[in-house]
Design a protein with these regions (language model features):
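Short glycine-rich substrate-engagement loop in P-loop NTPases that contacts/grips substrate
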Residues: 8-45
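Conserved P-loop NTPase "ATPase switch" module shared by AAA+ and STAND
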Residues: 42-60
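Structural recognition of the conserved hydrophobic beta-strand(s) that form the central parallel beta-sheet
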Residues: 50, 76-82, 103
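Conserved catalytic/switch belt of AAA+ P-loop NTPases
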Residues: 61-79
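Interdomain motor-coupling "hinge/lid" segment immediately C-terminal to the ATP-binding subdomain
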Residues: 82-84, 88-189
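Accessory nucleic acid-recognition modules appended to NTPase machines
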Residues: 144-302
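Active-site ExK catalytic segment of metal-dependent nucleases
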Residues: 302-312
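Domain-level recognition of nuclease-like catalytic cores that cleave nucleotide substrates
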Residues: 340-361
Length: 361
């Protein structure tokens, strides 16, 4: 019940004290006879404590470890933050075997249709693709200017608080331009060297180390994901080039609509995110000089996937299927598209309509 839940959002402007003692003060709230809204807590009931942006508390790892070992109190502790490094280093060592991690993503297509009360079909999938899954978009007025202003503020907040302030960025303009570059080139193979050369061609002075570090920070803040390239013949990850996918297509749709980015690239981005949500480790692959959009592993399951806008033309069918036919094993092979119809299976390769992919994962 509501009285048994304590939620603390530490990124709020009124939270001035972020010393380690703040942790003890938060836990002290529910040991009193009152809690938020005056609800009382029975000693027999379990308490749920949610602390958002916990990394803002000094030495928070030690505090979390301390309370996770307190078996005299009945509570469940949930911590969240906007950095992929939260569960690396000291915290992972301190809490080894005593935590469960839940990656959180923007709304999926299934959640989108549920909220909008829509049937799952091509029309609603295109609507999701052209809107995105950022939760706030579902409560804002459906006016592009309002939505664009919100997403611009969200992007600026993430870049400022999660990256610029945290890592003392010297060139904030380069950071923002790199994010715009990743949005505009999502689903394409790129390398740090390519990116450096691009900026130099635009008259920007920058170096390999700075670009690599800034892109790493963008990844750490979950604004974009790096998808490594895997050689199916050599069974190894290839260094150099990789693909990047953005956290949500809303950033593309509302902030950078002018960049060259077709429906096929958007679909590939959505398929990648769907695989992540389903818990797969995802790579982009190559086999016998042919590219495979995705190699996905989860446990003992392996799936190869190609994504393409439409399979209307025979040459498109041959191209997409040829990459999968070149793989000489018996693992699942899927071609995902936005066609209204489904092609019959061919050489063990199954055609899937994009809005039905979730049910197969």
């Amino acid at each position: 019940r509501k009285g048994n839940i304590l939620l603390a959002c530490l990124d709020e402007s009124f939270v001035y004290n972020r010393k380690s003692c703040l942790f003890h003060q938060l836990f002290g709230l529910w040991t009193k006879e009152w809690i938020y809204l005056g609800s009382t807590i029975s000693g027999q009931e379990e308490i749920y404590i949610f602390i958002d942006e916990v990394q803002l508390i000094e030495e928070w790892e030690k505090s979390v470890n301390s309370y996770s070992q307190d078996y005299t109190e009945e509570y469940e502790l949930f911590i969240s933050g906007s950095s992929s490094r939260m569960l690396s280093g000291e915290l992972a060592t301190l809490l080894s075997g005593r935590y469960v991690q839940f990656p959180v993503y923007p709304f999926s297509y299934q959640e989108y249709t549920e909220i909008r009360h829509l049937e799952q079909n091509r029309e609603s999938y295109m609507g999701y693709m052209n809107t995105g899954g950022i939760p706030e978009l579902f409560v804002l007025p459906e006016k592009q200017e309002v939505q664009r202003n919100y997403l611009s503020a969200l992007k600026d907040t993430i870049l400022l608080k999660d990256i610029i302030q945290r890592y003392s960025i010297r060139d904030p303009r380069l950071l923002e331009d790199l994010f715009a570059f990743l949005v505009g080139n999502a689903s394409n193979l790129v390398s740090i060297g390519n990116i450096v050369n691009y900026f130099k061609s635009q008259g920007r002075k920058t170096g390999y180390d700075a670009v690599a570090a800034y892109i790493g920070y963008i990844e750490d803040s979950f604004l974009a994901y790096r998808c490594e390239r895997f050689d199916l013949r050599g069974k190894e990850i290839l260094s150099g080039t990789a693909k990047y996918y953005i956290n949500d297509l809303a950033f593309k749709n509302f902030l950078y609509p002018g960049t060259a980015y077709g429906v096929g690239y958007k679909l590939e981005n959505l398929v990648y995110l769907e695989l992540l949500r389903a818990g797969y480790d995802v790579y982009t692959g190559c086999a016998k000089e042919k590219e495979v959009d995705f190699i996905a592993w989860k446990g003992d399951r392996t799936i190869y996937l190609q994504s393409t806008y439409m399979l209307v033309y025979e040459q498109t069918v041959r191209r997409e299927y040829a990459s999968l036919e070149a793989i000489q094993d018996n693992y699942e092979k899927l071609v995902v598209s936005l066609d209204d119809f489904c092609l019959p299976s061919h050489e063990g390769i199954r055609h899937v309509r994009a809005w039905e992919l979730h049910g197969l994962l």
